[in-house]
Amino acid sequence: MTDAPPTTGLHHVTNVCTDMSETRAFYEDVLGWHTVKRTQNYDDPGTPHYYFSPTPAGEPGTNVTYFEYPHGRGQPGPGASHHFAVGVEDEATLQEWRDHLQAHDVRVSDVKDRTYFKSIYFSDPDGLVFELATTGPGFDVDEAAPGSDVIDPYDQGYAGDGDDDGDDGGGH
């Protein structure tokens, strides 16, 4: 451990989209999230900055925010985010989400077994990869102390099929 001051966890995550109305429709109509704040980028006045949350009040730690840059395109690689994961209670809920996403014409992966949890993957309108992951049994039962074991997914038969880039229904 270090002598770093404590933190309380993630406050929010900010991404970039090319069309805020399309992003807002995705969060509200497909994911069922709430638009909890509409403002502008404080460092780039005039650039829309929206906050979305699965909770009506948008408590810290639940917000995903977006800046709108219509002509901006990121690329995968160092310094870029690969995906972000949102928890669901159990495998039944994960399957409900898979069915729900397919009903909204969202390409979604099969359920992936990730040793500690199970997941599905899909992308938003700009290609940002989402993961929905079960909460258990997971981290509290697999090791004596968190981070004490190294799991090799190839040795244990959990490795992906290489179809995990998010643009074709895969995504990790």
Residue ranges and their predicted role:
Residues 22, 31, 36, 63-64, ...:
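Catalytic cores of nucleotide-enabled group-transfer and carboxylate-activating enzymes in metabolic
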Residues 1-3, 69-75:
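Short beta-strand/turn micro-motifs at beta-sheet edges
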